[in-house]
Amino acid sequence: MGHCYSRNISTVDDDDEIPSATAQLPHRSHQNHHQTSSSSSIPQSPATSEVNPYNISPFQSPLPAGVAPSPARTPGRKFKWPFPPPSPAKPIMAALRRRRGTAPHPRDGPIPEDSEAGGSGGGIGERLDKNFGFAKNFEGKYELGREVGRGHFGHTCWAKAKKGKIKGQTVAVKIISKSKMTSALSIEDVRREVKLLKALSGHSHMVKFYDVFEDSDNVFVVMELCEGGELLDSILARGGRYPEAEAKRILVQILSATAFFHLQGVVHRDLKPENFLFTSKNEDAVLKVIDFGLSDYARFDQRLNDVVGSAYYVAPEVLHRSYSTEADIWSIGVISYILLCGSRPFYGRTESAIFRCVLRANPNFDDLPWPSISPIAKDFVKRLLNKDHRKRMTAAQALAHPWLRDENPGLLLDFSIYKLVKSYIRASPFRRAALKSLSKAIPEEELVFLKAQFMLLEPEDGGLHLHNFTTALTRYATDAMIESRLPDILNMMQPLAHKKLDFEEFCAASVSVYQLEALEEWEQIATVAFEHFESEGSRAISVQELAEEMSLGPNAYPLLKDWIRSLDGKLNFLGYAKFLHGVTVRSSSSRPMR
Ligand SMILES: Nc1ncnc2c1ncn2[C@@H]1O[C@H](COP(=O)(O)OP(=O)(O)OP(=O)(O)O)[C@@H](O)[C@H]1O
Ligand SMILES: [Ca+2]
Ligand SMILES: [Ca+2]
Ligand SMILES: [Ca+2]
Ligand SMILES: [Ca+2]
């Protein structure tokens, strides 16, 4: 009971509610907001455009504890408050049913990329060019029928193709009104939504894109008609609880779409049961993801900062305004939780209460029906709902999790491997030695995933060269990947041109310390790793050198002293663990993680 009334929450004062009238501040934020505000006490790493992962903790918000961010947005984007207040019922069933019955928008309102409401983000009086360059003859090609769905930004109708390749076929047409495009940014959003639908259309769990048109009043997006309705309706129809086998079948489809668009460098930002549709009413209907209206490109070396999404599904780091693809994984964690137990993991009477809950409360895994749900399923959900985005599984990893592994339609390349390998090959020899020792202690389960990724990269003579990484990425590239500039990472992997990674070293390179640390066996793993390090990787290191290794300044020296053994000048166990973790002075001394 009381899913969100955890101990954490009850310590929060009630006066930090987000005032619902802080709407539409003209406040400007910029891409680096989070970094700049948290960098004051943390020395920055040498001038690279990369985000230093060690400097970013989801717990280092520039905001006071419990306070959700101000509505500062990407330039010109307004934050619309309040969105429909959540109903006080806890089980998703009742809450959703009520909302559907009453509100004109039957669903959880998204935290919108605002497109309605007066004013223009590009400056008052500016004339907006609402010409998209799309074809104009929609009416000549399609016959419009009844409405099949409605959202905040448009409505979707049934239609029939009158001519062309799909003549006679029924389709869905999302009609987006130009009158709602009141800023250059909202026009850009529609342009991007169409571009993404088109680029990602090939995947079996993406809705198929056919065509796009416009006239003076509307944009018409023609796509595959999904006649089975929304996943939300199906959740409501069966009382909100799925047997594990069925939950798995749904999640595998959600994750395989997500792994695909994440590999393209696209973050959806609005994953929720309303945005998944079944192709038919049949038992074996395929699930498709729709609505890329809030989606964006996620460059590998940048973090997004606009607070968008739907309150119940929004990840903590989104509220802290520094996030990337992991935010979608959190939303899938929320969906998983709902599928399995029928309740929301994070709940509150008001939007700010929901946000506090998301930031601080631990979801309830103790009350009914959780005792009857398998421990492995619970483990799965927990590894998606980790508040630290670095400790969360990726979509590709989630597909390889033992709970889902058997259902698996085939593993997908995980871009996070590229990021980790890139860091590894650019790291100091000392750090690489530390990681090599760690790789010898990786649990069997995690090795299964790494082996699969190794094979997907198609090693030659038992090892991976730079061109294997290039070829693999190219194989899966769509226009979206080009736009998100993920392949740029290959330039930073140049040191690999003269090297070959065998499986052992690949493991050292692509193991995520953060994820291992989230495991119950971490202590044990670190102990074994340290033994290896002692016998083959360690050497004496000075405090200064260690500080440099960790991109820390002289103010860290006193702390680092405790990590080095006076006996032989080598790292002690604590030092080794901290070094692996890459902890910042701030989070080690005053803000313990978790
Ligand atoms: N291809 C489709 N086939 C059948 N129904 C669809 C299709 N696309 C959309 N719909 C229906 O129309 C609804 C609204 O579509 P969509 O989510 O794309 O619009 P939106 O205005 O962006 O919504 P939101 O308010 O969630 O942002 C969907 O929830 C769904 O019920
Ligand atoms: Ca909707
Ligand atoms: Ca939608
Ligand atoms: Ca949308
Ligand atoms: Ca953006």
UniProtKB/Swiss-Prot annotation:
Residues 34-49 have a biased composition (Low complexity). ATP binds at residues 148-156, 174. Ca(2+) 4 binds at residues 566, 568, 570. A lipid is attached at residue 2 (N-myristoyl glycine). SUPFAM superfamilies: EF-hand, Protein kinase-like (PK-like). It holds the Pfam family Pkinase. Its main location: membrane. Residues 427-447 are annotated as: Calmodulin binding (CaMBD). It is a lipid-anchor. Its EC number is 2.7.11.1. There are 3 contiguous domains conserved in the CDPK subfamily: a kinase domain, an autoinhibitory (junction) domain and a calmodulin-like domain. The autoinhibitory domain (408-438) inactivates kinase activity under calcium-free conditions. This is CDPK-related kinase 6.
